[in-house]
């Protein structure tokens, strides 16, 4: 049984869980196959729907997502809602699922998602991605932002992602992915879904 840590660095609750290696490998293999085929890559291009200033954003087929990932996501959304408000979710509808390929100097500006619940999972990360001469090492990390800083209340939560991290959060929670200076690919997936709010 995979551990889930649910916490609120500010108002909204955020959950972090580890993705099984089997799922990571399946997604990476599928993305590599798409990238190696120009016609598939063109059909799968999802960048026009997103704000990311990155090389490639790829939509995976519903067939692939349903077969390899959906069960894991739904299970953990149910756990997340149960831990947050102690209620059982009856309906979960996955609206979108895509993969982001981020390279040196690319970034994702501050944004929020649609749906009710969103998530991000990390599939590949360059070595020493946060390396910097600065004291605050945010290169390649993700910031979650809510409200403004006040006494005894933070407005920022910074996460330095590791391969296999999956973060679940309310869709309205603003976030940004910082650029990095290292060679290599930071590969992640994101998703949006709706739940039955009557739970």
Label for each model-derived stretch:
Residues 2-87, 105-108:
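Non-heme Fe(II)/2-oxoglutarate
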Residues 17, 121, 191-193:
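Preference for bulky hydrophobic residues occupying beta-strand positions
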Residues 86-97:
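A short coil-to-beta-strand element that immediately follows conserved catalytic motifs
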Residues 27-31, 177, 189:
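A structural signal for short hydrophobic/aromatic patches embedded in well-ordered alpha helices
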